[in-house]
Design a protein with these regions (language model features):
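Glutamate identity and glutamate-enriched acidic tracts
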Residues: 7, 27-29, 51, 66
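Short, surface-exposed beta-strand/loop micro-motifs that present aromatic residues
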Residues: 44-48
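A cross-family detector of function-defining hotspots
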Residues: 18, 23-43
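Flexible, solvent-exposed short loops/turns enriched in glycine
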Residues: 38-39, 49-51
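C-terminal basic regulatory modules in eukaryotic proteins
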Residues: 50-79
Length: 79
């Protein structure tokens, strides 16, 4: 999943952190473009590429249905 953005990189990463935590994932150390988190066997990642005005949302885990449910929640919680 992706969506267009117009915000600066630090703001996008801050929103990514809030979305990951508010979806119930434990955050990990961010990189210059990504924020990730774990929740059991599931991993969430949000990648901000502000210079190209885009943010990507990725979810992985053992159940495709559950991963999609988490992905929808993550996407909805990103401002």
């Amino acid at each position: 999943m992706w969506r267009p953005i117009t915000e600066a990189q630090p703001n996008c990463l801050a929103h990514a952190r809030v979305a990951i935590v508010n979806t119930g994932f434990n955050e990990s150390e961010p990189s210059s473009q990504s924020m990730s988190g774990k929740r059991g066997d599931y991993t969430a990642s949000i990648r901000c590429i502000s210079e190209q005005n885009i943010v990507f949302f990725v979810m992985s885990g053992p159940s495709a249905d559950e991963a999609l449910r988490y992905l929808d929640q993550l996407y909805a919680r990103f401002p």
